[in-house]
UniProtKB/Swiss-Prot annotation:
GO cellular component: blood microparticle; haptoglobin-hemoglobin complex; hemoglobin complex
Stated name of the protein: Hemoglobin subunit beta
Tissue spec. comment: Red blood cells.
Residues the entry annotates as binding heme b: 64, 93
Gene assigned in the entry: hbb
Organism superkingdom: Eukaryota
Length: 147
């Protein structure tokens, strides 16, 4: 079980309460697909993923990026039981979709980069530490079914 300080809980809740899901989600997933092109294989039904411009303007990518962030919001609401919160999603990604669990970390890094760019100076080291701890716990939970 993960220990969360009151400060970490506050930072994470604050980030998600102010996050523009419609902006951050599409940008983060698009960045992941452009920077790590091998991740595109999981999105073959999304249409044009042939170049950065096509990815960045792809409505399916944008919608899934938003969906991912709303999925993270479930973790924020269940910080004391993140593993159980993502158990079904872990099973889906491992057994049906066969997603390499390393890709969850890549996407979490892209989310962090996009969020940091959006928050600017407000994305302090303390904020980054709490946010990345949260994402690491979620990534671990999503990878549970693979172990």
């Amino acid at each position: 079980m993960v220990e969360w300080t009151d400060k970490e809980r506050s930072i994470i809740s604050d980030i998600f309460s102010h996050m523009d899901y419609d902006d951050i989600g599409p940008k983060a997933l698009s960045r992941c697909l452009v920077v790590y092109p091998w991740t595109q294989r999981y999105f073959s039904g999304f249409g044009n993923l042939y170049n950065a411009e096509g990815i960045m303007s792809n409505a399916n990518v944008a919608a899934h990026g938003i969906k991912v962030l709303h999925g993270l919001d479930r973790g924020v609401k269940n910080m004391d039981n993140i593993a159980a919160t993502y158990a079904d999603l872990s099973t889906l990604h491992s057994e049906k979709l066969h997603v390499d669990p390393d890709n969850f970390k890549l996407l979490s890094d892209c989310i962090t980069i996009v969020l940091a760019a959006k928050m600017g100076h407000a994305f302090t080291a303390e904020t980054q530490g709490a946010f990345q701890k949260f994402l690491a716990v979620v990534v671990s939970a999503l990878g549970k079914q693979y172990h």
